[in-house]
């Protein structure tokens, strides 16, 4: 269910697809976390589609997801990197993959669809709150302490 602050996204959220882009990993946890984030965003009912894509090591790839979304008649596709900070992946690798995928699907997309590349998570007080919550949980013994696991 959409939260009050979700309404700021716009009245046409139903015409927007969001692609959460992760790095990818040989371990299953990375993909599982991204899928859970996708599920939670999807439950808000804001967007027509919410998908996950990976740079490497997992599927689906960025290119595969964009090509599939290109055929759905959406007005906007927002590519949201799920990375904490800017780096080579967010400033070079992902934009290049998006460009290649978008150009490859241009025949299916047409001129009226926009691909928007969002910023990584970055420095944000909401992240500070999460970090402080995790520290508090650790101090209060709600999480496994390192000395217990050694």
Model-derived segments and spans:
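Active-site-proximal alpha-helix that buttresses catalytic centers in soluble enzyme cores
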Residues: 1-150
């Amino acid at each position: 269910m959409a939260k009050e602050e979700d309404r700021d996204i716009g009245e046409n959220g139903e015409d927007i697809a969001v692609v959460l882009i992760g790095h990818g990993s040989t371990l299953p946890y990375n993909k599982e976390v991204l899928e859970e984030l996708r599920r939670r965003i999807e439950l808000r009912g804001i967007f027509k589609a919410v998908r996950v894509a990976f740079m490497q090591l997992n599927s689906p790839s960025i290119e595969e997801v964009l090509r599939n979304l290109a055929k759905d008649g959406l007005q906007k596709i927002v590519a949201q990197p799920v990375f904490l900070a800017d780096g080579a992946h967010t400033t070079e690798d992902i934009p290049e993959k998006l460009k290649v995928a978008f150009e490859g699907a241009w025949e299916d997309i047409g001129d009226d669809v926009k691909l928007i590349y969002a910023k990584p998570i970055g420095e944000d007080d909401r992240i500070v709150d999460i970090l402080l919550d995790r520290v508090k949980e650790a101090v209060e013994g709600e999480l496994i302490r390192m000395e217990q696991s050694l």
